[in-house]
Structure formats: C-alpha cells, structure tokens
C-alpha cells in the first residue's frame, strides 16, 4: 500500500476577516469535496483567539496533492487576497515529488517548510467513520 501524502499549513487570518473566512470556508470545502474524490481528509482548525487557521489534508498519494494544487490555484489566490495574511508554517509528510515540493516552496515563500518523506510504518483507515465498536 502506498503511504499517504499529508499536508499541514498554518496561516494568519487578516484582522477583521474571521467571519468572512468562516462564511467562505464551507463553500470551498464543498468545491473540494465535489471535485476531488481521491482526497481522504480536508479540514481546517481555528486557534482559540481566531487569528490563525490550520489546514490539514490527507491525500492517498502525492499525485492527488498535485491535482489538488492545480485545481485550487484561483481559490488560494482569492483566499490570500481576501482572508489570509500570511503563512506561519507548512509541513509535508510522506513520499513527494520534485514538482509537488516546488509548488509547496512557492506557496510557502519565506515561511518554514518542513518535509518528512520517509514513513516508518502505520496505517490509514479510510472508512473509519463507518466502523463501530463491538461490546
């Protein structure tokens, strides 16, 4: 089984734009869910004070991430123009490609980009929400 490609990005939300971001995000999530059937997980988490957002993506492989980046380019540009001030850190876990790393470096700019390409074992449950506990 191929190891997943995991991306975690942290971004500062522009002052006064939290509510606008919170209205925009569900529309963006719907777009991603409808157009990217291979994407395993796509979630955002706000800091306690609402000044930062962390975005976590789990892809089955790097080609899924490459497709994602090409598909959402305009959405990313819109988000930075309207809601997001800057990135504060990016992390990549799992096997990557030169083209994916280059896209991530361009997106990161001066922000630290941590890459950990070598998995040492684990598992992925893509149907975990359907599981149930037997007592």
Model region roles, listed by residue range:
Residues 1-53, 60-74, 83-135:
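Short S/T/G/P-rich N-terminal loop/turn motif that feeds into the first structured element of a domain
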């Amino acid at each position: 089984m191929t190891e997943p490609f995991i991306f975690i990005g942290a971004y500062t939300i522009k002052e006064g734009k939290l509510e606008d971001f919170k209205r925009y995000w569900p529309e963006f999530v719907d777009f991603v869910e409808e157009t990217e059937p291979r994407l395993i997980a796509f979630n955002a988490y706000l800091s306690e004070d609402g000044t930062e957002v962390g975005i976590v993506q789990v892809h089955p492989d790097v080609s899924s991430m490459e497709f994602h980046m090409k598909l959402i380019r305009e959405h990313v540009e819109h988000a930075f123009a309207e809601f997001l001030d800057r990135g504060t850190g990016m992390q990549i876990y799992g096997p990557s490609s030169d083209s994916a790393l280059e896209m991530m470096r361009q997106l990161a700019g001066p922000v630290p980009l941590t890459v950990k390409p070598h998995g040492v074992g684990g598992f992925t449950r893509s149907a975990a929400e359907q599981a149930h506990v037997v007592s």
